[in-house]
């Protein structure tokens, strides 16, 4: 296909103290959040004031953006927990028809298809499934996590889950940073620990 493989091109986005996510250097300041070990991902990625995460967004995209491969997030973070943790989510903000997460994104239909031959103990007819579609205001594109094995300052690179997806023009790309991610990984910091990120990193 003419659009595959994707021509390699790396773009670096830097978080800003005003909540922006821009091409260029990061702000020469730090921001902090307080870990909430019971916070859901849905709460963390919803816009508005939230002391339990940091959220950065680009401006509205003037043209479609294709993300292909594994995003990386580099940060310098300081904490005081015996063992700390950081989670990051890359988010597409913008209303669109998407595959919904409910029921693992599919539902069982009333029709059946035959796969091979039936036997006395195995019926080859199976109900068909279809994608569960619906409009949603956002979509998580990728996630990543890191465990911080001792208190202090850590400089690290988080390799996020690979994806190949197009973010439409008019949407915003967002990055949420949290501590515990109880829906995805084991919680190792169950306290209200303050995490500080140096945006110059």
What are these regions (language model features)?
Residues 1-201:
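C-terminal, loop-rich substrate-recognition/catalytic regions characterized by aromatic stacking residues
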């Amino acid at each position: 296909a003419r659009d595959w493989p994707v021509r390699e091109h790396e773009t670096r986005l830097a978080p800003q103290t005003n909540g922006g996510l821009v091409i260029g250097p990061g702000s020469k300041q730090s921001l902090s959040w307080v870990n909430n070990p019971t916070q859901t991902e849905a709460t963390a990625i919803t816009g508005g004031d939230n002391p339990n995460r940091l959220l950065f967004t680009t401006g509205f995209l003037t043209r479609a953006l294709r993300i292909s491969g594994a995003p990386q997030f580099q940060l310098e973070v300081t904490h005081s927990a015996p063992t700390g943790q950081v989670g990051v989510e890359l988010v597409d903000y913008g209303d669109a028809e998407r595959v919904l997460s409910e029921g693992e994104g599919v539902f069982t239909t009333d029709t059946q298809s035959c796969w091979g031959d039936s036997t006395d103990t195995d019926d080859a007819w199976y109900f068909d499934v279809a994608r569960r579609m619906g409009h949603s205001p956002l979509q998580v594109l990728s996630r990543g996590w890191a465990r911080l094995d001792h208190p202090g300052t850590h400089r690290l690179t988080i390799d996020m889950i690979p994806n190949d997806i197009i973010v439409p023009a008019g949407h915003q790309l967002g990055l949420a940073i949290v501590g515990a991610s109880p829906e995805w990984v084991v919680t190792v910091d169950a306290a209200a620990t303050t995490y500080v990120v140096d945006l110059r990193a």
